C-alpha cells in the first residue's frame, strides 16, 4: 500500500512539473513571437538617460548648401544628452553666415583647451535657439585638423565624427553607444 501511495505522489508531482514546463515553453514562444523581447536600441527614450553623453563633431569646408539640413537633422536625434559641434574649416563660401543666420549664433567666450595641436581657432559661437549647438570657426587645416579642434572643444567623454552632408536616423546615437555600454573599457568602434 505504501508503494502505491509513493508512486501516485511521484506521478502527481512529475505530471504537475511537466505541465508547468510545457506552460513556460508556450509562454516563452508567445513572448518571442509577439516581440516582447527587444534589443537595447528598441527600448524607450527614458532608458537613454543612462547612456553617456556624446559630442557630435561635424567638420565642414565650403558646405553652405548642405550644412543647414545636416545640423537640423542632427538636432532632431533621439538621445538624452548630446551636443553638436560644427567646425568651419576656413570655408571660402558663406557657410558661417548661413549658420549664423539660421541658428542665431552669437560669439561665445569659452575656455578652449588645446590638448591636440590645431590651426588657429578664430572664434567659437553658440546658438541662442539650440543650447546644444556650437560652431567653431578656424583656419583651414583639413578634416583631421578640424576633428582635432572639435575634440579640444567637446564637453563630453564620447565623440562621433560625421561628414557635413550626413543625415542620421533618429536612433543612430543609441546604436553607436551600445558597444560602450556593453564594454566600458572600449575606447573606439
Task: Specify the residue positions occupied by each region the protein language model found.
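N-terminal membrane-anchoring/stem segments of glycan-assembly enzymes
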Residues: 1-48
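Glycine-rich, basic loop-to-helix element that forms the pyrophosphate-binding segment
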Residues: 42, 70, 115-154, 174-175
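Cell-envelope/extracellular polymer assembly enzymes that use nucleotide-activated donors
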Residues: 52-55, 83
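A conserved acidic beta->alpha catalytic loop
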Residues: 88-108
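Short aromatic/hydrophobic "clamp" motif used to bind/position activated sugar donors
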Residues: 159
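Conserved donor NDP-sugar-binding/catalytic core segment of glycosyltransferases
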Residues: 170-189
Amino acid at each position: 500500500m505504501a508503494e502505491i501511495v509513493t508512486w501516485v505522489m511521484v506521478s502527481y508531482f512529475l505530471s504537475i512539473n511537466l505541465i508547468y514546463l510545457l506552460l513556460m515553453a508556450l509562454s516563452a514562444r508567445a513572448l518571442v513571437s509577439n516581440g516582447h523581447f527587444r534589443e537595447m536600441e528598441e527600448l524607450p527614450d527614458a532608458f537613454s538617460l543612462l547612456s553617456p553623453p556624446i559630442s557630435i563633431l561635424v567638420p565642414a569646408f565650403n558646405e553652405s548648401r548642405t550644412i543647414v539640413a545636416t545640423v537640423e537633422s542632427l538636432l532632431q536625434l533621439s538621445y538624452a544628452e548630446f551636443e553638436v559641434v560644427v567646425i568651419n574649416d576656413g570655408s571660402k563660401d558663406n557657410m558661417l553666415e548661413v549658420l549664423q543666420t539660421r541658428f542665431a549664433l552669437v560669439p561665445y567666450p569659452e575656455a578652449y583647451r588645446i590638448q591636440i595641436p590645431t590651426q588657429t581657432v578664430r572664434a567659437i559661437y553658440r546658438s541662442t535657439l539650440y543650447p546644444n549647438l556650437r560652431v567653431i570657426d578656424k583656419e583651414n587645416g583639413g578634416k583631421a585638423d578640424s576633428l582635432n579642434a572639435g575634440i579640444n572643444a567637446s564637453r563630453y567623454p564620447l565623440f562621433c565624427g560625421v561628414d557635413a552632408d550626413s543625415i542620421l536616423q533618429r536612433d543612430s546615437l543609441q546604436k553607436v553607444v551600445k558597444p560602450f555600454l556593453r564594454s566600458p573599457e572600449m575606447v573606439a568602434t
